[in-house]
Amino acid sequence: MTVIRSWLYVPGDRPDRIAKALAGPADAVIVDLEDAVSVAAKEDARRTVLKTLAEGAEFFVRVNAPATPAGEADVAALAAASDKPLGVRVPKAEDPAELRRVADALGVPVYPILESALGVENALALATAHPLVAGISLGEADLAADLRATGADALTWPRSRIVVAARAAGLPNPVQSVWTAVRDLDGLRVSTEAGRRAGFFGRSVIHPAQIPVVHEVCAPDPAETAWARELLGRLESSGEAAWIDDHGQFVDAAIVARARWVLALAESGEKHVADPANSGPAPENDVTVAT
């Protein structure tokens, strides 16, 4: 099982930052052609993405909204390229038919971002629109603007809706939207912990300094990992379908599934080694705009 905890956005028109991001501690890199790139730089960014893919780099791409001229150009360029990204994030997703068109054209996993009231209303339809839909998420800044909503709890219902739609469609738990207060790492931790409790897993980030916090929140604690190993070891040795464990807890298929997930997270954390040189304080001019 591949577990991605951190998804780092990097501007598509900055090859220097792309190279740094690919060498850094993020589990996944998203080269952005949308919000992080000015209109004047869109074509240069597109060429940079194609060149970097041709060099063998592995990363995800966020295209512009498919209904826009820039989005149409992004999809056409990636569809024609012989070297494909690992997947494509599709912003402003609202129409399942449009998402199907993008998936058919690209032939790689697609990740619709729901950023409007209509997108949230169509969450399950988007999540099940095509076999290549690999995950759904919220674009919270745009969604809040569309809803004219403010306050910390304003998006509680849409967040729950996305979690339910993703799991109903058999998709992974949604990735949390970016935390835009880059210097507020304590706030990032609190928000990410709340998101994980609510059914999100992993987070989009806009600076390497945010990555260690996200990874720490995503990691199961040692006691939980030990519990999972013990439970799965007993299952393998005894083959029991259900039992009462030593702590008096009834163990059935749902608990076993939870243990497998905990162990997958623990093993994923062991495979990723962060580079401290790439995760220092966040300077204002080293931030990707990804809302």
Where are these regions (language model features)?
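Expand to "…catalyze enediolate/carbanion chemistry for C-C bond making/breaking, isomerization
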Residues: 1-291
